[in-house]
Amino acid sequence: PPEAHNMRKLLLTFVLALALCVPSLAAETWNVGTWKTAQTIQPFLYAPFADGAAVKVHPFTNPGDQKAALLAGSLDMTGTTLALAIQAASRGEPIVLVASLGNKCSALVVRKDGGVKSVADLKGKKIGYVPGTMHEILLRETLTRAGLNPDRDARLVRIDFFDMGTALSRGDIDAYLSGEPLPTLAKRQGYGEILAYPYYGEGIGAINSGMIVRRDFVEEKPERVMEMIRAHRKATEQCMSDKAFWLETASKMFGVELDVLRDAADNMELVW
């Protein structure tokens, strides 16, 4: 209905203004890290739920850099992949997982007309990935299920998420496994095809990313951590209850065509 559309536009304008403007007289500032993607958008939407706190969002492209910034004290909370969070905790690093961020969003993409028709055809091929991410774990699981040894039967090439499309279109790699909207973009722009969605009921599953804080931050400021988690929950629920608002906001914030996000939406899930 026109009324609902107008209300959504008004709310979208309000959220965008809050995300871009940091009040100078706020009692406290939350420094939060995340990626500039639709499936990790929640921190950009905390402001209406922050009870007067200023929210400064720091976008990253690599989960390792996010964790390093958190441990250095530059961030109060940050998104990261669950693989990296588990790895960090196993090493005794002082991080605490306080919320989920997103579940599924991954896809295995191959070069169009590159001759790869099945995962088994990736033997000897160059595959782009980001180490220490859930995408790496899902890639390794997918190759193993097809009878390939990830370390011997394929050449895994470290490439930043946002460089994968260019590398595939140029022929520098034969495939990559990454999150949306890159797989959908590759398909729509004609240089790639989605070979598989790497989710298997009896395997790793659709887990992907979460929010972490430093242990000392939890111990010293437990109430602030709870406030941040509440804002995270409300931002997540807002997006999941209003899919149009979520995708329209992501499109405007991150410069991704709305139709691309609509095509990718079934492969993205926000959680808290």
Predicted regions and their residues:
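Periplasmic-binding protein-like
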Residues: L101-V110, G192-V218, V225, I229, ...
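A conserved hydrophobic position in a structured secondary element of the catalytic/binding core
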Residues: T80, S178, V213, E220, ...
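Short helix- or helix-capping micro-motifs
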Residues: A186
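Short, Lys/Arg-enriched N-terminal segments with co-localized hydrophobic residues
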Residues: P1-N6
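Bacterial N-terminal signal peptides
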Residues: T13-P23
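Secondary-structure end/capping motifs
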Residues: E219-W272
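Short, glycine-/small- and polar/acidic-enriched structural segments
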Residues: E28-D151, R155-F161, A167-R170, D174-E180, ...
